[in-house]
Amino acid sequence: MQKKYYELFFIVEEQYKNLFLDFAFDLGIEAIEEKDNGVYIRSHESLEEFSWALEIFAQKLTTTFNLNHKIISNLSLVEKENKDWIQEYKKGIKPILVDNVYIHTTWQEEKKNCINIKINPALAFGSGHHESTYSCVKFLQKFSKSKLRALDLGCGSGILGIIMAKFGCNVEICDTDELAIDSSLENARLNGVDFHKAWCGSIDKANGLYNLIVANIIADVILILEKDIKNHLEDNAILILSGILDKYSTRIKEKFQDLELIDEMQINEWCSFVYKNNKKG
């Protein structure tokens, strides 16, 4: 084991965090940890070039979203004494119980009398602890039913798609990051379920109508995809929207006011909404 390693830390606005995580994965970064309201990246190789690339990426996002403030802050790069970070990482991840769904890692035991969801968090995009994912898991236990045609839009690690499949839905998944698709398919295999279709891209590549769509993605993307989402809803279909910071909730409600809002939940600053496709007028 090498004696030293490099640690890069930065704080990023929550709604843009996944963009930065995707960026890091695309550049071959593997040791990523979300902690202390920020992101830690560790490597035995120098991270100076990546730190520079990160700042350029942040500047481009600031321009793209026409922001008047910085997306990232507290950027620091230090050299530290080495540890067995794999074991440290494993110690830091706890299983999560949401009603009757128990989400755990590949190295943790299953829970009796629960629907067990096994996730390899090293593959990509989280292990179910985020507030928006928690809300989706609660809602999916209520609205997932056998034989429904369902779509996990922005699937990430595949947790939500796997849950729908466990409830008997015919599940399709999509994500704009190919790594997320690969990770979701691997996690599905770990859980003994199959997705009927999986593609790299968004809902514009979907064919036909769905009885259930879950979109746990940031508000900006939901607003962009609003028409495409509605165009793929079957009559009386259920739509679950999550990953929405409370400051965007009014805009989301205005955009989807032609659908019937039947349930909602807020945990800390994160909002989730459930709509039924009973279009008004």
UniProtKB/Swiss-Prot annotation:
Its annotated compartments are: Cytoplasm
Which GO CC annotations does the UniProt entry carry? cytoplasm
Q: Which UniProt keywords apply?
A: Cytoplasm, Methyltransferase, S-adenosyl-L-methionine, Transferase
Lineage top rank: taxon: Bacteria
Q: Which residues form the signal peptide?
A: none
Q: Which cysteines are joined by disulfide bonds?
A: none
Listed binding positions for S-adenosyl-L-methionine are: T133, G154, D175, N216
What SUPFAM superfamilies does the annotation carry? S-adenosyl-L-methionine-dependent methyltransferases (SSF53335)
Concerning its family, UniProt says: Belongs to the methyltransferase superfamily. PrmA family.
**Protein's UniProt name:** Ribosomal protein L11 methyltransferase
Q: Which organism is it from?
A: Campylobacter jejuni subsp. jejuni serotype O:2 (strain ATCC 700819 / NCTC 11168)
The primary gene name is: prmA
